[in-house]
Design a protein with these regions (language model features):
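Glycosyltransferases and closely related glycan-assembly transferases
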Residues: 83-96, 104-119, 132-140
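Short alpha-helix at the nucleotide-sugar/activated-sugar donor binding site of glycosyltransferases
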Residues: 112, 135, 265, 283-284, ...
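Donor-nucleotide binding loops and adjacent catalytic segments primarily
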Residues: 41, 46, 175-270, 304-307, ...
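Acidic donor-binding loop of glycosyltransferase active sites
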Residues: 93-95, 258, 262-281, 288
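Short amphipathic alpha-helix
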Residues: 13-24
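Structural loop-to-beta junction motif characteristic of Rossmann-like glycosyltransferase folds
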Residues: 52, 116-117, 269-270, 287-295, ...
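Conserved nucleotide-sugar phosphate-binding/catalytic loop shared by glycosyltransferases and other
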Residues: 3-8, 27-76, 81, 161, ...
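Active-site-proximal region of nucleotide-activated glycan assembly enzymes
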Residues: 2, 42, 53, 112-178, ...
Length: 331
């Protein structure tokens, strides 16, 4: 089987694509799989790191506002449609699968025009713009939440699959757990809290953790904290203001991004983060308690909906973004 997977932007779009690719390879070792992305997103790091080839095209998210900048992006995205078509003619895929990001518009549309079967995965309970716009052109839409099915209009076929995840549950022995903690720079003496605002980082969460460090509230636990690559220098500057060196915070390991997330999530006792569909699914699969701070101002407030799925089974506590402080989080 020859497969193209379109995924771009954030880890929440890219990791489901990698999970699908890994499963295809597991079932059919001779499969040929390539990814299509942009030159700007996290796919440039995560896809090659997972062992897959990445082809890049021009693609941009467009706003409703009429502006010179938007017109330029529209022109580049039209170019991307042609670039995607060229890749498909050369690679000759049996199927094209989109797992999120504005890259899906050009790739799914190109595949449809060439008569190539298509699939699109929607992670959230409230379908995004890409799914709504591409519903007629997509042969099968896969959804993570059953509630999403009636919200997708004019689709040929909608199937409830759940979210494809890379992270699996492991029952580590004491020695293995201690090895992982030691590599992180922590130990087995205190509980471990994982803090991550997703691949883009979360400013409000980062500010709360800086407050905890500044006031030395972290006496009863250790922490591994992923700030997000774009916010690492901001956090470093905030800590510098309090004469705290980012690499010398007792009991807290601070990183831009965590690449061995499967190991870290398995050894962590509690997870703190946003409530994207991928994050919520991974936490549920691992059976870990969590504190979730849903991202506000997203379409249909879908992160709050995601978080409530875990809250309703007493697996998570929700703190609203506007109510978040270091003191409240520490409590």
């Amino acid at each position: 089987m020859r497969v193209i997977i379109a995924a771009a932007g954030t880890a929440g779009h890219i990791n489901p694509g990698i999970a699908i690719a890994n499963k295809i390879k597991q079932e059919e070792k001779d499969s040929k799989i390539i990814f299509i992305g942009t030159t700007r997103g996290l796919e440039n790091d995560l896809v090659p790191r997972a062992g897959y080839e990445l082809k890049t095209i021009n693609a941009y998210g467009l706003s409703k506002k009429l502006s010179i900048e938007n017109i330029k992006k529209m022109y580049q995205t039209c170019k991307g449609y042609g670039e995607a078509k060229k890749i498909m003619k050369e690679f000759k895929p049996d199927i094209v699968i989109g797992t999120g990001g504005y890259i899906c518009g050009a790739t799914i549309s190109s595949a449809h025009s060439l008569g190539i079967p298509t699939m699109l995965h929607e992670s959230n309970a409230f379908p995004g713009k890409a799914v709504k716009l591409l519903a007629k052109k997509t042969d099968t839409i896969l959804v993570s939440f059953q509630d999403a099915i009636p919200r997708i209009k004019n689709a040929k076929n909608v199937v409830y699959t759940g979210t494809p995840v890379k992270i699996k549950k492991h029952e580590y022995g004491v020695n293995e757990k201690n090895r992982i903690l030691k590599e992180i720079g922590l130990n087995e003496t205190k509980p471990v809290i994982l803090v991550s605002g997703g691949s883009q980082g979360a400013q409000k969460i980062n500010e709360a953790i800086v407050e905890i460090i500044k006031n030395k509230l972290n006496k009863n636990y250790q922490m591994i904290w992923a700030t997000g690559p774009k916010q690492f220098d901001v956090v470093k500057g905030d800590l510098d203001n309090y004469h705290i060196l980012i690499n010398h915070v007792d009991g807290i390991k601070i990183l831009p991004y965590i690449y061995n997330m499967e190991e870290v999530m398995n050894v962590a006792d509690v997870t703190i983060g946003r409530a994207g569909a991928m994050t919520v699914t991974e936490i549920a699969n691992l059976g870990k308690p969590s504190i979730l701070i849903p991202l506000p101002n997203v379409s249909h407030n879908h992160q709050l909906y995601n978080a409530k799925v875990l809250e309703n089974v007493k697996a998570a506590k929700i703190i609203l973004n506007e109510e978040l402080t270091g003191e409240k989080l520490n409590d």
